[in-house]
Amino acid sequence: MRFVRYALVLVVAFEVAVGECFLAAARPFGHAWPVAALAAVLGNVSLGVAGARALERPGGSAGPGLVWVGVALTLASGRQGSDVVVPNTGRGVALLLAGAAAAAGVVAVTVAGKNGTTPEGHLRR
């Protein structure tokens, strides 16, 4: 049953990544705010924690991040004559960097929490 839950987390990670990539060019209220980068951080942290809980292992937090990075890089790169969803602007780069950093950060925190190397880890022993 946990693999079904984990597969659902991966599907949601795919959908969230596509939505955030289309938000990269958004201009809310006429201003160039990096809304997609904020959504990427919040989405990757929450999906990483959900992946670790669904798989019941700290390594489960890596899957949603890898799916997100794969989708974001695919939509950011274009071939000759094709469209690019993530623009090559500051907001597009902020989306890619913030999302990848959040995905890596949640993996580091969940694995460190399992190994007891966090500041609170010695209290759990």
Model-derived segments and spans:
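Alpha-helical transmembrane segments and their cytosolic membrane-interface
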Residues: 1-18
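Membrane-interfacial segments
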Residues: 23, 27-31, 55, 59, ...
